[in-house]
Amino acid sequence: RQLHINRFVPYGRAKTFENKLNMEQFYKWVDRGYDFLRNIYINYYKQNKEFIFNIDVSNDLCNQVYSKGRKTSCGVNCNQISIDSNGNVYLCPSLHIEEFELGNIRTDNITEIMEKSKQKYGEIDVEMLSKCKNCEIKYYCGGGCRAIAFNETGDLYGQERNCDNYRNRVFDLMLQ
């Protein structure tokens, strides 16, 4: 069994509607869905049932709480790339922005593209994110979504606006 739900990342045309969204209502909706899915995951976990469970909408909180040691929240510049229909390679599916274009698989060697990316961006982990360095849950959280941080701050290494709410969610899960 497998469940995968993508996160809401306001970028591109969706960014123009971001200010029109009632974020309080949006997060209440996300929380209701998150609570429902969290209960499913906890039940599977307690029963030792195998279940591939990726909840990007809540940044995969359940898996993170039960697997300490994460230095990244995803595979950005580590084991993930995104390729568009023209062969352009990007750091992340949510960062299809010219600034983050790494090369093109039609004209460039994929190994060289990855090496160039590592040289340009280094390892993007909680140890290099200034707001995360002293955070008590950094190895559960992994530093949050780099695409959301970039879209909110203009900085790939910035902090998501929702960081404090996220930290509280992790603590709530730990107490269950």
Give, region by region, the residue ranges found by the protein language model.
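Radical SAM enzyme [4Fe-4S]-AdoMet core and its adjacent flexible, acidic
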Residues: 1-80, 84-86, 94-105
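Flexible mid-to-C-terminal extensions adjoining Fe-S/redox cofactors in radical SAM and related proteins
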Residues: 88, 94-176
